């Protein structure tokens, strides 16, 4: 396992248990340190308690999801790298972060994560 991956902390924010836990297990096997939250409120707690390198978040969640969650991330997490996953959003929607559309292949997710973590800029 790559030491550089282990040093990266990824926060997965996903309200569907099966998806959240599958993503967690996949990224753990790839060597990342992974935190999870089931909604935006839980994610805020994780962000307060831990240093996070990348947020991988669903767009549509019942509790603090959707446009309010995106606005929160854009306003209060300006130095945070964020990747949105969604089966709901369309390319024409104005989202200030990169979006990976569901259903997606895990290798595409892994590539996008690696690109964001290698990028020295934000978002």
What do the PLM-derived regions correspond to, one by one?
Residues 84-86:
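Hydrophobic/aromatic residues positioned on beta-strands within the core alpha/beta folds
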Residues 45, 67-78:
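Short amphipathic alpha-helix used as the core "switch/output" element in two-component signaling
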Residues 20, 62-63:
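The feature encodes the CheY-like receiver
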Residues 36-45, 66:
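Helix N-cap/capping motif at the beta->alpha junctions
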Residues 58:
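Active-site residues of response regulator receiver
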Residues 16-35, 106:
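Two-component/phosphorelay signaling modules centered on CheY-like receiver
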Residues 1-9, 105-123:
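Non-catalytic signal-transmission and effector/linker regions of two-component phosphorelay proteins
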Residues 102:
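A Lys-centered signature of the CheY-like receiver
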């Amino acid at each position: 396992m790559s030491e550089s991956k282990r040093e990266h902390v990824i926060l997965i924010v996903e309200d569907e248990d099966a998806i959240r836990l599958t993503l967690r297990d996949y990224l753990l096997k790839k060597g990342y340190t992974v935190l999870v939250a089931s909604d935006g409120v839980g994610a805020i707690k994780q962000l307060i308690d831990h240093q996070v390198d990348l947020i991988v978040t669903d767009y549509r969640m019942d509790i603090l999801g959707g446009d309010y969650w995106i606005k929160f991330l854009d306003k209060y997490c300006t130095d945070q790298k964020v990747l949105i996953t969604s089966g709901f959003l369309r390319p024409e929607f104005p989202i200030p972060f990169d979006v990976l559309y569901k259903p997606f292949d895990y290798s595409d997710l892994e590539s996008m994560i690696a690109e964001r973590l290698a990028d020295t800029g934000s978002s």
